[in-house]
Amino acid sequence: VIGLGCERFNPQELYDAVKATGKPVAKFVIQEEGGVTKTVERAVTVGRQFAAELDRQERVPCALRELMVATKCGGTDATSGLAANPAVGSMVDKVVAEGGSAILSELNELLGTEKYLAKRAVSPEVAEKIYDAIYEIEDVLRGGLDFSLPENRNQLISPGNFAGGVSSVVEKALGGVHKSGTAPFQDVLQYAMPPENGKRGLFLMDYESQDGEVVTGMIGCGSQVVAFTTGRGHATGHPLAPVIKITGNYKTYAAMTECFDFDASDIISKGASVEEVGEKLLELVIRVA
């Protein structure tokens, strides 16, 4: 933990919170260490010590029920909702069926799907949480705009989405929801807050779509691996968990092969089943995790 020394957020608070978990942590305050150079030197020394300790850890087998997968999309095109997202959804269903967990978020890109999501809630209480979360995001985004007008609805998607063949925010939302598969939603999680009482299954995290921030939040909820879909090409990553990059666009995969880990385009180009591709994706997720 590195801080300047006079921020509104005291680095000591973050240090104390991490230490309470039992994880190794160190704190450096630039104004107390004698400047940036000395801070970096001391932090690098401690970081190397932490790395040496981590190198002694060994990977051990664990049950699939211990896995939590974060799902995210970015750089969406028409193939995302047809191939990549359904493949992720199939993988999510398999993880949840084995007692594992998964998270869907990006609520500002799910506007209009709230009834569908609420129908999959495990209880009326969870359904109400889903409605509340999405309606709150919609109120924030509205900002005086009338979303009954097409030109305003289209404010919620990028020029790249249009160029990739996505016709509207409705199509984007209906495609994005496929990442969650078909399992029931167990609860709505707050940002970076793990499920209570060790609950497992499919969850919705209450947060809007900012790639780095939303992924960080889902990792904070307990996700050990991220399934990230993109049709246009999005070379994203994260320092805290592996990000598996998935595309359903064979042209994008061919043009940016080094950026991708999984090609789901066989669903479109070769008629492969979503179930078949989802199984292959699950195998990759298990290897990575």
PLM regions and their residue ranges:
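Metallocofactor- and cofactor-centric catalytic cores in central/energy metabolism, strongly enriched
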Residues: 1-225, 229-289
